[in-house]
């Protein structure tokens, strides 16, 4: 463009005036092949106390497609004042998310072309007029992928598009495309690993839709092990199949339909007459998709496995959040290595899954154990075996009524501190335990239960009334039930978008099961304020975080006694809300095994509706005792440092070591200088939080209500501590205000009072002038203009006031 000085143009101008014209001139269709400002991530949710916000994320400037949802290339633009290659690294990051081999960086002068299909010359500079055509990139892409001519009709098949604008997320697109690619290449066993809450069923639908529409697969079976999974799938994601789809009922497979949704239990069973799958020939289905395939399809002795073996010629796609790999069960042995994996950690980092905090509650009998006196009878007259009972026994072989009530009381107290209407799932050891927990919660919440008898419901496989409320529990628009007690039924497939509290009072040894249970809370619902959740752990299940197989660590781990939650005057909320992030831990991981527990689900017994019961109540003999004095333990606080290590030392020692090893805080003088030089002290406070300094925990150890500045001067540098009130008194003694006119003195004096009450963060924000008693003096802009002249003068006065506040007493030589 003659006469245009590119160096004065913005990045947007460069895209509009130079890059897009070059791309269009090369033959790319603006409607179907070019997308601008493509947002690939949602932005990680960061929890700050009780509030949560998203980190802002950048979007890819331009993505080029062969056709919608089949991406080929990324173009990253920069203003002309930058080098032509400036955007390359950013573009490569987007390209890895989209699984594309081509990246173009440009500042409007030309392009740097990164071409993974050409290892001999990975990067080259090309002119604007030499931008590749769609056909050129598609041919190179197909060669890079190794596609044959026969595969092209399948891999080019359109996605389903309902016209609403809904499109797959980048990882769903990768999972769909890689699976379709694998099927088109003739692969018959495929595994997809996607974290709970990331849209596995929608992903499965698009895979099936494309293969079905391409006539590559004509008869499809979708297998699940829970009625709710099948019903949700039919009603929601699979709805576009319309009259071509059916749910298998009455143990009858109707060959008139092309897409069949079935419970495993509805088409097989221990008796020959229950094996409905044999009604059709072994080659009837040519595609089988197995939802939650970790639950048994890969187990050699599984009843479900016989279905897969009968239809052995069909392509079989396993979907799971948690592939099972034990001596007895291996998804990978059966399906092969996953064609794509999207982990819990990635989901949280990308902002598609909710982060969480953990509160561990220690009860004395859990830690110390309990032993009956010799010959002691339980409350039903059974003699209790004389041995020490511990955490693994409680609610499994030994029931202590007082422990049940203490757990229920702690749950109740937590909800009262937060919100009694927060959706809560309580995972219990078995149906009996879930029933007793429901009763205890009803007894402790009479005011809520009187408002609505469905405030607490037991939702287990044996209870038709409870199961009938499952849809209401997971419906964000329904307030009741609020608390669901369960054992196995809700561990998988329950889309509880608004669940804000997950309670673990169940012995969990399986990493697979643990991940599934955590997944009940990871869904996000911004409309209803669900951006993060809390795990309340009574059975040390969250020690599985230490297992290397676990990813997606909690924001915070807090170990407390029940009294910390029930005591209104305790600092439980402040500790839980302290703004630190956790990335790891050093707990003993000896519990992280996939061993089969002594007490397990009896898969031989089925409910009348074709679903397995949660457990077999006659499997283990239980003793029921009461009158046990159940106490709480001394409080232990664990916290994560900036390196993600779980710290148990004195927090004062940790703070001192952390500060002194940082050169900016290595001496009192350097700390004071940095503090005084900072235009806003809040910036320093937040910076120190990133180093792992927890102000609430530190203040509790010191035992005084000190300003962050004085906490550090005292703990790290050995200075005598001054309270905020003492600092205010010192400022007033020095007659500092006489340099200002009376109207300004009035404002500064009031700011000083605000500092004494609230701290330095309060007075640094100009919005403080909207609060009482400033509101009686006029609007903020009037206060600043009439009493200080302008905003700059006001900010300077506040800064000088802070310097007066933080003057150190003279040090002796």
From Swiss-Prot:
Family per similarity comment: Belongs to the HsdR family.
PANTHER family in alphabetical order: ATP-DEPENDENT HELICASE IRC3-RELATED, TYPE I RESTRICTION ENZYME ECOKI R PROTEIN
GO biological process: DNA restriction-modification system
Subunit structure: The type I restriction/modification system is composed of three polypeptides R, M and S; the restriction enzyme has stoichiometry R(2)M(2)S(1) while the methyltransferase is M(2)S(1).
Any one annotated GO CC term: cytosol
Binding-site positions, ATP: 195-201
MF terms (GO), sorted A to Z: ATP binding; DNA binding; type I site-specific deoxyribonuclease activity
Classification via InterPro entries: EcoEI_R_C_dom, Helicase/UvrB_N, Helicase_ATP-bd, Helicase_C-like, Helicase_Restrict-Modif_Enz, HSDR_N, P-loop_NTPase
Cited SUPFAM superfamilies: P-loop containing nucleoside triphosphate hydrolases
Keywords: ATP-binding, DNA-binding, Endonuclease, Hydrolase, Nuclease, Nucleotide-binding, Restriction system
Name the record gives this protein: Type I restriction enzyme EcoEI endonuclease subunit
Residue ranges of every copy of the Helicase C-terminal domain listed in the record: 410-561
Additional remarks: Type I restriction and modification enzymes are complex, multifunctional systems which require ATP, S-adenosyl methionine and magnesium as cofactors and, in addition to their endonucleolytic and methylase activities, are potent DNA-dependent ATPases.
Region feature Disordered, mapped onto this chain: 568-591
Helicase ATP-binding domain sequence ranges: 181-341
Function: The restriction (R) subunit of a type I restriction enzyme that recognizes 5'-GAGN(7)ATGC-3' and cleaves a random distance away. Subunit R is required for both nuclease and ATPase activities, but not for modification. After locating a non-methylated recognition site, the enzyme complex serves as a molecular motor that translocates DNA in an ATP-dependent manner until a collision occurs that triggers cleavage.
PROSITE patterns associated with the record: HELICASE_ATP_BIND_1 (PS51192), HELICASE_CTER (PS51194)
The organism's place on the tree of life at top rank: Bacteria
Known catalytic reactions: Endonucleolytic cleavage of DNA to give random double-stranded fragments with terminal 5'-phosphates, ATP is simultaneously hydrolyzed
């Amino acid at each position: 463009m003659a006469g245009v000085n590119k160096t004065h143009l913005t990045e947007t101008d460069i895209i509009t005036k130079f890059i897009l014209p070059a791309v269009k001139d090369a033959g790319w269709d603006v409607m179907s092949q070019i997308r601008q400002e493509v947002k690939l991530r949602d932005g990680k949710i960061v929890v700050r106390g009780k509030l949560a916000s998203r980190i802002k994320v950048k979007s890819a400037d331009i993505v080029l497609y062969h056709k919608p949802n089949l991406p080929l290339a990324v173009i990253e633009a920069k203003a002309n004042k930058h080098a032509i290659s400036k955007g390359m690294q950013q573009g490569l990051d987007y390209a890895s998310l989209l699984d594309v081999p081509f990246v173009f960086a440009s500042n409007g002068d030309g392009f740097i072309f990164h071409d993974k299909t050409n290892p001999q010359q990975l990067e080259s500079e090309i002119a604007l007029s030499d931008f590749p055509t769609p056909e050129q990139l598609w041919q190179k892409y197909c060669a890079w992928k190794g596609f044959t001519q026969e595969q092209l009709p399948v891999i080019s098949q359109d996605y389903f598009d309902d016209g609403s604008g809904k499109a797959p997320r980048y990882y769903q697109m990768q999972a769909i495309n890689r699976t379709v690619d694998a099927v088109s290449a003739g692969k018959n066993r495929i595994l997809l690993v996607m974290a709970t809450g990331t849209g596995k069923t929608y992903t499965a639908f698009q895979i099936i839709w494309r293969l079905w529409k391409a006539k590559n697969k004509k008869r499809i079976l979708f297998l699940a092990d829970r009625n709710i999974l099948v019903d949700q799938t039919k009603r929601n994601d699979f709805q576009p199949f319309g009259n071509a789809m059916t749910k298998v009922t009455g143990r009858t497979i109707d060959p008139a339909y092309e897409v069949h949704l079935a419970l495993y239990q509805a088409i097989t069973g221990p008796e020959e007459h229950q094996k409905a799958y044999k009604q059709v020939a072994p080659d009837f289905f040519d595609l089988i998709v197995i939802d939650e395939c970790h639950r048994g399809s890969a187990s050699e002795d599984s009843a479900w496995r016989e279905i897969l073996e009968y239809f052995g010629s069909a392509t079989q796609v396993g979907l799971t959040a948690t592939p099972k790999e034990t001596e007895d069960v291996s998804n990978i042995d059966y399906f092969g290595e996953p064609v794509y994996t999207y982990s819990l950690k990635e989901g949280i980092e990308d902002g598609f899954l909710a982060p969480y905090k953990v509160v561990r509650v220690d009860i004395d009998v859990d830690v110390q154990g309990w032993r009956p006196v010799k010959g002691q009878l339980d409350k039903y007259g059974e003699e209790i075996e004389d041995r020490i009972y511990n955490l693994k026994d409680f609610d499994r072989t030994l029931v202590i009524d007082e422990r049940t009530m203490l757990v229920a009381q702690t749950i109740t107290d937590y909800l009262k501190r937060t919100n009694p209407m927060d959706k809560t799932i309580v995972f219990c050891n078995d149906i009996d335990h879930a029933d007793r927990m429901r009763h205890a919660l009803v007894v402790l919440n009479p005011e809520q239960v009187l408002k609505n008898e469905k405030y607490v419901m037991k939702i287990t496989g044996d209870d038709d009334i409870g199961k009938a409320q499952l849809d209401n529990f997971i419906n964000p628009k329904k307030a009741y039930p609020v608390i669901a007690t369960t054992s196995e039924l809700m561990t998988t497939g329950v889309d509880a978008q608004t669940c804000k509290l997950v309670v673990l009072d169940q012995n969990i040894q399986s990493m697979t099961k643990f991940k599934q249970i955590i997944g009940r809370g990871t869904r996000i619902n911004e409309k209803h304020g669900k951006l993060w959740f809390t795990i309340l752990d009574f059975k040390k299940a969250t020690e599985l975080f230490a297992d290397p197989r676990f990813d997606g660590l909690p924001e915070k781990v807090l170990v407390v006694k029940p009294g910390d939650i029930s005591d209104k005057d305790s600092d439980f909320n402040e500790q839980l809300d302290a703004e630190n992030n956790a990335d790891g831990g050093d707990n003993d991981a000896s519990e992280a095994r996939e061993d089969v527990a002594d007490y397990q689900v009896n898969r031989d017994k089925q409910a009348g509706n074709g679903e397995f019961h949660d457990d077999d109540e006659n499997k283990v003999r239980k003793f029921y005792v009461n009158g046990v004095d159940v106490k709480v333990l001394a409080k232990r606080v664990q916290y994560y440092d900036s390196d993600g290590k779980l710290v148990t030392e004195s927090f004062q020692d940790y703070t001192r070591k952390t500060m002194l090893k940082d050169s900016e805080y290595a001496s009192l003088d350097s700390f004071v200088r940095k503090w005084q030089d900072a235009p806003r002290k809040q910036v320093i406070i937040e910076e120190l939080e990133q180093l792992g300094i927890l102000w609430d925990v530190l203040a509790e150890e010191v035992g005084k209500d000190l300003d962050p500045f004085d906490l550090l001067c005292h703990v790290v540098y050995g200075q005598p501590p001054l309270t905020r009130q003492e600092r205010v008194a010192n400022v007033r003694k020095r007659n500092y205000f006489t340099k200002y006119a009376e109207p300004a003195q009035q404002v500064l004096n009031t700011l000083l009072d605000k500092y004494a009450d609230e701290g330095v963060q309060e007075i640094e924000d100009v919005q403080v002038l909207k609060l009482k008693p400033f509101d009686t003096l006029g609007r903020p802009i009037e206060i600043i203009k009439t009493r200080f002249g302008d905003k700059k003068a006001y900010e300077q006065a506040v800064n000088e006031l802070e310097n007066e506040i933080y003057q150190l007493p003279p040090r002796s030589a």
